[in-house]
């Protein structure tokens, strides 16, 4: 496999798999993607929060939304952990789809080609965060890359994919004690539940996610008007990082409050309850209208 080969991206392959991705996007994950502004021509750095352990279903939704809007002719790459490239079937698919091993050099080379580049700065730590932290946005290195290459940043926030499993802990302490960071570049050893394995004990194998609805917002491009040398100033890097993360947190809070994500989105629950009541009503025997003072519960609601 070629996790560092930019020429392995195959436009024809991407065109061939789009129909399958459309089914996952529309029918399985019921993806909803909001675009605040068009993606500018030329190189751009998409910076996204990471969800769903190594299965990362939201990543596929981001890719499909981009291909639909701009077609596979527009060059795009995604930076990811290099371990999946060693999986025989997955490695070839990832290469052809435009995946590259996540490191600053690959990001630089892709941007120099004028590509749109998707990065998940939180890496495996963000992807394996505990369920309670599923709306959290974290980490930094993308700022220096954007400043050095003089490209705009388009933040991407997504909710729903991390509800496809339940992790109690990311197991960072366990990973350090076992030396997983040195052996496999893995900073986590998550513990929780995921289908089809049931209990997840330290090894973040890709899981089979249930059909959770994924709600994504791609924010407008952020430009900072700073020279490349600003990438070497820790104070400036921190300021840029803070502005990006605050924009992402604001958008994430809005998406969270909208409630249009998850296995049964909050915005859909009333309709689901109505359908369930209708279905159950057809199965239950008809009651005498005078039999109970609570026979008008449909009008008054369930206590």
Can you say where each PLM-predicted feature lies in the sequence?
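Membrane-anchoring hydrophobic helices of lipid-metabolizing enzymes
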Residues: 1-106, 171, 254-303
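Non-catalytic C-terminal accessory region of glycerolipid acyltransferases
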Residues: 1-17, 109-303
């Amino acid at each position: 496999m070629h996790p560092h080969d930019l020429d392995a991206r195959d436009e024809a392959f991407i065109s061939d798999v789009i129909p399958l991705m459309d089914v996952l996007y529309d029918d399985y994950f019921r993806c909803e993607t909001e675009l605040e502004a068009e993606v500018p021509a030329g190189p751009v750095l998409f910076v996204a929060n990471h969800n769903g352990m190594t299965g990362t279903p939201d990543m596929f939704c981001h890719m499909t939304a981009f291909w639909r809007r701009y077609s596979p002719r527009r060059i795009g790459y995604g930076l990811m952990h290099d371990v999946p490239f060693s999986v025989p079937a997955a490695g070839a698919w990832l290469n052809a789809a435009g995946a590259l091993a996540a490191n600053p050099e690959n990001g630089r080379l892709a941007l120099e080609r004028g590509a749109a580049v998707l990065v998940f700065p939180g890496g495996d730590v963000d992807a394996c965060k505990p369920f309670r932290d599923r709306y959290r946005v974290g980490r930094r290195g993308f700022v220096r890359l954007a400043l050095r290459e003089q490209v705009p940043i388009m933040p991407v926030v997504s909710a729903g994919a991390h509800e496809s499993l339940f992790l109690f802990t990311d197991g960072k302490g366990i990973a350090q004690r076992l030396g997983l960071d040195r052996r496999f570049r893995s900073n986590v050893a998550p513990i929780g539940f995921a289908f089809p394995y049931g209990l997840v004990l330290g090894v973040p194998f890709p899981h089979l996610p249930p059909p959770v609805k994924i709600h994504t917002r791609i924010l407008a491009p952020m430009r900072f008007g700073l020279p490349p040398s600003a990438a070497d100033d820790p104070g400036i890097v921190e300021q840029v990082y803070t502005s990006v993360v605050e924009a992402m947190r604001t958008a994430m809070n809005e998406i969270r409050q909208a409630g249009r994500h998850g296995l049964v989105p909050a915005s859909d629950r009333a309709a689901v309850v109505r359908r369930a009541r209708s279905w159950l009503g057809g199965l239950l025997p008809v009651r005498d209208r005078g039999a109970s003072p609570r026979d008008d519960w449909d009008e008054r609601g369930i206590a």
